Amino acid sequence: MRILGLDVGTKTVGVAMSDEMGWTAQGLETIKINEERGHFGFDRISELVKQYNVDKIVVGLPKNMNGTIGPRGEACQQFAENLRELLQLDVVMWDERLSTMAAERLLISADVSRKKRKQVIDKMAAVVILQGFLDSK
């Protein structure tokens, strides 16, 4: 059973995939999207779901520090609902507070250059989100 983890932003979607046992998350790719034009990367996500035989998708839910959900969180909830309808899969929302900061710290501690960090930060945030979900099981 593989699980896909997504960090949905305004310009990109970071993608992570679990191993078949559901123990570890690994960064897969970053999908460029354009919300204004209605391009959300659903075609590519659908391809990945088929290619890796995904059973479940975990979408990061950006909450405010006080636990409330703002406009970005609402957009992510709508993204998840659209995926659920399109792919007919279980789509779970997962609190992603501070996931990007955690990913940034991991990359800095690994001595990754600023330029390279910018290229992989969304994918790493998806790893942090998915690994948090996997660790909770």
Swiss-Prot record:
Protein family per UniProt: Belongs to the YqgF nuclease family.
GO cellular component, one term: cytosol
Official protein name in the record: Putative pre-16S rRNA nuclease
InterPro entries (alphabetical): RNaseH-like_sf, YqgF, YqgF/RNaseH-like_dom, YqgF/RNaseH-like_dom_sf
UniProt keyword annotation of Electron transport present: no
Subcellular localization, as worded in the UniProt entry: Cytoplasm
Pfam families: RuvX (PF03652)
HAMAP family the record matches: Nuclease_YqgF
PANTHER family: POLYNUCLEOTIDYL TRANSFERASE, RIBONUCLEASE H-LIKE SUPERFAMILY PROTEIN (PTHR33317:SF4)
GO MF annotation: an example: nuclease activity
Phylogenetic placement of the source organism: Bacteria, Bacillati, Bacillota, Bacilli, Bacillales
Function: Could be a nuclease involved in processing of the 5'-end of pre-16S rRNA.
GO biological process: rRNA 5'-end processing
Keywords for the protein's UniProt record, in alphabetical order: Cytoplasm, Hydrolase, Nuclease, Ribosome biogenesis
EC number(s) on file: 3.1.-.-
